[in-house]
Amino acid sequence: MGSSKSKPKDPSQRRRSLEPPDSTHHGGFPASQTPNKTAAPDTHRTPSRSFGTVATEPKLFGGFNTSDTVTSPQRAGALAGGVTTFVALYDYESRTETDLSFKKGERLQIVNNTEGDWWLAHSLTTGQTGYIPSNYVAPSDSIQAEEWYFGKITRRESERLLLNPENPRGTFLVRESETTKGAYCLSVSDFDNARGLNVKHYKIRKLDSGGFYITSRTQFSSLQQLVAYYSKHADGLCHRLTNVCPTSKPQTQGLAKDAWEIPRESLRLEVKLGQGCFGEVWMGTWNGTTRVAIKTLKPGTMSPEAFLQEAQVMKKLRHEKLVRLYAVVSEEPIYIVTEYMSKGSLLDFLKGEMGKYLRLPQLVDMAAQIASGMAYVERMNYVHRDLRAANILVGENLVCKVADFGLARLIEDNEYTARQGAKFPIKWTAPEAALYGRFTIKSDVWSFGILLTELTTKGRVPYPGMVNREVLDQVERGYRMPCPPECPESLHDLMCQCWRKDPEERPTFEYLQAFLEDYFTSTEPTAVHMATDPGKYTTAHKSRARVSSNTAVARPAAPVRVLLKPSV
């Protein structure tokens, strides 16, 4: 599969220390427009920094790439206001002869940005010109260029990043407020014996004069000044700001400019990860530079023409909880090239060594991530058709992403298209889809309910002891799986909502996402986060809930610090 030799990659995690870390560390879980390639070495530098500059500390994350780890802030967008000078947020090593390698902190002159995800740029440092991924840069001297600014990420995603046990107290980020347009939020990690590792959220308000404040007695002309101040003084916060929240390089939008239908010879299959009825999955390398996952389909599995048409739709689906489709080999045998997820399928992960250490908070969080990806599919009026743990992929930090969306519709195998053959996933399929072929987002909701049983049972096959024909008959008669062992009733109630006979009575994925993200949330700031219905929670379940988050308002410094009730 191609003779090109892979360049060794050493991706770095973005961890910065604004000041020496707190000793308390809590463990736990005129530019030429002709692109020319610069021969930059594949290394990472670690410059010293103060606020507004850039630094990085090398750290391997998953062994290959970091696209499957945590959500990276979405900073760059279309050029506005005539801005053409950008700063690099990450190192980037060129993948093709027309790419431009650059280092974090490098200033780049954008020649044009009409190419969408890949812009033609001229490095003011090296003098080289080439294409760059637009989401790796931000306008110079802008708030987007600050490493602590994470832009439009959700409260829940900020908590997922900050609750990494490796983060010391005071690890922080600044994000857009979800509830107040034009406002920001400072999210800070904290620790105490009552709640364990938790996150506090402080609303940053804007002055009419253009300044910012958390408490009105201490005002700042810029967010940079605010962050610099609270890095030295807690002054009512739960802790002074210590480290910028670590994150990783984002995925590029595609492998390179114009790299969609690629030659088979550009791929090297290296490690077989698994196989199924219709093909195999490999870890491999594209163009000798880029780690990818490659799904190979057996000839005859689906029409190449139909697949290519569907793939054009699939590549437009972009969400942090969907596995990114990078490229295709459209002649048989069809190859589907996606981002590589280091931990493999959720099903294998649950049944493997790591599965035994997963507790309810982690399982619910994984379910919430899947629901988030499917809520996006729902908004885009798309249907997955084969939602189950085997089609969810896991990366570092328990990041989960939905894979293989839409492919089931294209399979031409008779044992599959009959919908009752051995290859068809009857146990995950809604009755109206299995019996009449009515696949909708609501049949995906049914499948999500089955997936919840896979999570709570660590990968057990649904409907244990029953064959496919029996499952179909019993479900039509009203049978639903009972509550799995050690699963709270409130979660089983959610499963049963997903399994309502009338598809229109099933919840939306938007609802499922909100329910699961708030599953351990309490309205009182001092309470450990419990289930939506705490009365249905057992003592054993309560003992597992050791993480929480609050929105807090800083008060004037006093002998005893007081945190008000969370903001809505």
Swiss-Prot record:
The modification Phosphotyrosine is found at Y416. The active site is at D386. The phosphorylated form is termed pp60v-src. CDD domains: PTKc_Src_Fyn_like, SH2_Src_Src, SH3_Src. Residues 1-58 are annotated as: Disordered. It comes from the Viruses. This is Tyrosine-protein kinase transforming protein Src. It comes from Avian sarcoma virus (strain S1). The lineage of its organism: Viruses, Riboviria, Pararnavirae, Artverviricota, Revtraviricetes.
